[in-house]
């Protein structure tokens, strides 16, 4: 099973709000997911992002692939650097 970390759109028309979910890559964008690991609100001035870093690092170590947008959000939050250090420190 190929697992992706990607955004799921929530909110109403013209007011998007996103959850960062871990889901099977074959599932629809807003369909079934395994776990919610964060949120992203692009409408706030500083683009509010909340993350469960320990769960994200766990899923990345298990082989989950982040989407391009999620990879950018994780990089800005410093999670990808932690994952890289954790992976190559062995």
From Swiss-Prot:
GO terms for molecular function: structural constituent of ribosome. InterPro entries: Ribosomal_bS16, Ribosomal_bS16_dom_sf. It comes from the Bacteria. Keywords: Ribonucleoprotein, Ribosomal protein. Disulfide bonds: none annotated. GO terms for cellular component: cytoplasm; small ribosomal subunit. This is Small ribosomal subunit protein bS16. Belongs to the bacterial ribosomal protein bS16 family. GO terms for biological process: translation. PANTHER family: 30S RIBOSOMAL PROTEIN S16, SMALL RIBOSOMAL SUBUNIT PROTEIN BS16M. It comes from Streptococcus uberis (strain ATCC BAA-854 / 0140J).
